[in-house]
Curated annotation (Swiss-Prot):
Part of the 50S ribosomal subunit. Contacts protein L32. Belongs to the bacterial ribosomal protein bL17 family. Keywords: Ribonucleoprotein, Ribosomal protein. One of its GO terms (biological process) is translation. This is Large ribosomal subunit protein bL17. It holds the Pfam family Ribosomal_L17.
Length: 128
């Protein structure tokens, strides 16, 4: 029985899922918008939002925790220097999911996941 087990399996084993979301979180922080399937986008929210909350208080301990979860110094630097101060006054809900149709090959529902206060100069074409 799978009672009270949260999160989606996404037809992957645990280590593959962990690596995939680590990479996707890094891409989202780096580019501020990415295109993926809708279930992955919904699950990615659960990974990225705590990272941004962590980045709101800049300390060595928090930077180490963020590095442990992303394994990327560039991402950690952007989290704490750009995104942490940007979302300092926001209590949560740092990401937005926009449905964008279905994938041509297998008709999978696709979505953009983006940071809410993203600069308008970047286009959605950059996400693809």
């Amino acid at each position: 029985m799978r009672h009270r087990k949260s999160g989606r399996q996404l037809n992957r084993n645990s280590s593959h899922r962990q690596a995939m979301f680590r990479n996707m979180a890094g891409s989202l922080v780096r580019h501020e918008i990415i295109k993926t399937t809708l279930p992955k986008a919904k699950e990615l929210r659960r990974v990225v939002e705590p990272l941004i909350t962590l980045a709101k208080t800049d300390s060595v301990a928090n930077r180490r925790l963020a590095f442990a979860r992303t394994r990327d110094n560039e991402v950690v630097a952007k989290l704490f220097t750009v995104l942490g101060p940007r979302f300092a006054s926001r209590a949560g809900g740092y990401t937005r999911i926009l449905k964008c149709g279905f994938r041509a090959g297998d008709n999978a529902p696709m979505a953009y996941i983006e940071l809410v206060d993203r600069a308008d100069s970047e286009t959605e074409a950059a996400a693809e």
